[in-house]
Every structure is written in C-alpha cells, then in structure tokens.
Amino acid sequence: RRSIYTTYFHNSRLLVSVGQRVQRGQPIALAGSTGRATNDHLHFEVHAAPTDSLPAIIGDDRYPPFTTNPELWIEPLPGTGIVAGRVWDSQGRPVRQARVYGLVKPEPQETPFSFAETYGERTRGTPAYQEHFAVSDVPAGEYVVGVTIEGQKVFRRIRVEPGKLTWVEFRP
C-alpha cells in the first residue's frame, strides 16, 4: 500500500489550509516566484510513499526519496494523450538520461518541447508503471519516436489517442 502526497512550491498565496479537503478543479494556490525561483511558475511534485511519515517523504537532502513523474497523475489536455515507456540497454538495465525524440507538445509556447529524458538516479517510475519516462499533453496522432542506446539509433512507431496512455519500449 502506498500513500500519495503532492507538494506545490513557489506559491505567491495559498488559498486553502493544510488538511482541508479540496474538490477537483478547485484552485488551491496562486503561482509565484517565492523561494529559489527566477520567475512565476508552479513546481509540482507527486510522492508515492510506502509510509505516511512526512519527514521520511520529504527527506533531508532536497531529493525526496519517493518522488514520481507528475505527468502521469494529471489528466491530459483535451485532444491529447500521454506517452510513457522504458529504455533498456543490451544487458536489460534502464538507460539513464537518454533523450527520446519525436514527440511534440504545443504548450507551453514560451518554452518549446524538444525531447523527453529518461529518469536519472533520483527519480522513480510510478508504482503502477515503473516507467523510465513520461510525457503528457501530446496531441493525438501518429509519431515515430527514437532514442540512441549504446550508440545505436532505435525507433518505434506509436499512435497517441486522446485521453489515453500510449506505452513504448526501446531495446537495442
């Protein structure tokens, strides 16, 4: 059993109290640039923890031990889906920080999307998927996605459907 916790950083103002129940779509805070931030934005984290101990979840080294990719926890924008998957080397090990090319995301326009990157040492896949990467808000359509593994380019053809998750795996 896992407890799911979310954290929201850089808020200019909180609109709810700690422990208050909220409804889907209810604003809980206003984005800001508090803390170590250079512009207004929301830093959102999802923690899938085997404990409900807040000190164990947050951690003391600024890298919470149960952080997962929040893109798999948020409903995609209308007309878009989610692409998630795994990238393996020839020995069956995850390839860390590999760039997965070929996907597009129309938002945000001010910071164009160019590639997904597989997780590094400190990021974990979600408990349900154990994915190595995930990208939300990908417009529905056909894509050829690719990654380089051990110097070899590997491609896969995928179809993204609105509101659904598309799974893809890469091996040399």
PLM regions: where:
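Short histidine-centered loop motifs in beta-beta connectors
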Residues: 2-25
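Structured interaction patches on ligand/partner-binding surfaces of diverse proteins
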Residues: 149-172
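Acidic, glycine-rich catalytic/binding loops that coordinate metals and/or anionic ligands
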Residues: 17, 45-130, 139
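Hydrophobic core positions of the immunoglobulin-like beta-sandwich fold
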Residues: 8, 135-136, 158, 170
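Short hydrophobic beta/alpha edge segments that flank linear recognition/processing sites
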Residues: 23-35
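A short, solvent-exposed beta-strand micro-motif common in secreted/extracellular proteins
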Residues: 139-151
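Gly/Ser-enriched beta-turn/beta-hairpin loop segments
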Residues: 1-5, 37, 62
